[in-house]
Each structure stands twice: as structure tokens, then as C-alpha cells.
Curated annotation (Swiss-Prot):
Coiled coil: none annotated. Belongs to the universal ribosomal protein uL11 family. GO terms for cellular component: large ribosomal subunit. The lineage of its organism: Archaea, Methanobacteriati, Methanobacteriota, Thermococci, Thermococcales. One of its GO terms (biological process) is translation. Keywords: Ribonucleoprotein, Ribosomal protein, RNA-binding, rRNA-binding. It holds the Pfam family Ribosomal_L11_N. GO terms for molecular function: large ribosomal subunit rRNA binding; structural constituent of ribosome. Forms part of the ribosomal stalk which helps the ribosome interact with GTP-bound translation factors. Gene3D superfamilies: Ribosomal protein L11, C-terminal domain, Ribosomal protein L11/L12, N-terminal domain. This is Large ribosomal subunit protein uL11. CDD domains: Ribosomal_L11. SUPFAM superfamilies: Ribosomal L11/L12e N-terminal domain, Ribosomal protein L11, C-terminal domain. InterPro entries: Ribosomal_uL11, Ribosomal_uL11_C, Ribosomal_uL11_C_sf, Ribosomal_uL11_CS, Ribosomal_uL11_N, Ribosomal_uL11_N_sf.
């Protein structure tokens, strides 16, 4: 049976040190080879924490494959806004402001990993993460924007986004 190691690494900057080295060293794999593969597979997520699965297919032959997940929603929001972190005073001092277009872009990236039944619900999940990070949406409190979504204020925007999929 294949062994699986799951780690969170910075895109394009995995190193043989912790958490990778200690996790894959005991499996008998060439750590440098694994690190190089991970860096190649995650380079487009540079600066973001990315979930990675290392699947050891045959320990005797030392064969493995890498599966790269989608970064957490908070990482995608930070990347979209170009901010290093969320607000340390969420609710008082905004860390940034997302447009609905940016919310929908992030929701489209994450929808396959969410429990949301549609793009509207996925967008509301993204907005919930923005709220916890102290990020406003359309210059407003994220809770207000969630109510507006329920009221149909952004229906035209969602219809366009779903057509483009």
C-alpha cells in the first residue's frame, strides 16, 4: 500500500529542512529529488502556503508522485490583495479591500474543495474568510455584502461568471 505524507510548504521554496526532511527521510526517498519536484510543481504559488501530498508508490524502487492542492482561501486573498497578512484588529482596521470580481475569482479556484453547492455560496464562504482576516468587500463590512448577495444585488455578476466557466 502506498504511503502518503501531507505537508504545507511555501510555493516554489520547499527545502530539505522541516517539515519536509523529517517527514520523507524515513521513507527512503531522495530528499533533494522530492524537494526539487515539489518546487517545480508549486512555483506558480510563490509566496503562498500550499498543501502538498507526497505519495510513495513503491518504496523499494523509491518511486513517488506529488499532488499539489489549492492554497487556503486566506492565502489566495492575501495574494490577490498583495498584503503580507490579515488585520491584527479585524473589524476595526481593514487590511485591504476585495472587489466582488476578486471574490468570484477566488471562489472559482476553491469551489471544488468547498461544500458550497454553487458559485454564490462559494463566494459567501470566501467573504466569510475575508471577514475573519479584517478585509472589506466592495468597501463594506463583509456581512453586509453577504446580505446583498442573498438579496440578489450581485446576481448579474454571478450569471456572467457562471457563463464564463
Amino acid at each position: 500500500m502506498a504511503q502518503v505524507v501531507e505537508v504545507l510548504v511555501e510555493g516554489g521554496k520547499a527545502s530539505p529542512g522541516p517539515p519536509l526532511g523529517p517527514a520523507i527521510g524515513p521513507l527512503g526517498l531522495n530528499v533533494k529529488q522530492v524537494v526539487d519536484e515539489i518546487n517545480k510543481a508549486t512555483k506558480e504559488f510563490e509566496g503562498m502556503q500550499v498543501p502538498v501530498k507526497i505519495i510513495v508508490e513503491d518504496p523499494k524502487k523509491k518511486t513517488f508522485r506529488i499532488e499539489v492542492g489549492i492554497p487556503p482561501t486566506s492565502q489566495l486573498i492575501k495574494k490577490e490583495l498583495g498584503i503580507p497578512k490579515g488585520s491584527s484588529e479585524a473589524g476595526h482596521t481593514p487590511a485591504g479591500n476585495l472587489t466582488m470580481e476578486q471574490v468570484i475569482k477566488i471562489a472559482k479556484m476553491k469551489i471544488d474543495q468547498m461544500l458550497a453547492p454553487n458559485l454564490k455560496a462559494a463566494a459567501k464562504e470566501v467573504i466569510g474568510t475575508a471577514l475573519s482576516m479584517g478585509v472589506t468587500v466592495e468597501g463594506k463590512d463583509p456581512r453586509e455584502v453577504q446580505r446583498e448577495i442573498d438579496e440578489g444585488v450581485y446576481d448579474e455578476l454571478f450569471a456572467k461568471a457562471e457563463e464564463a466557466q
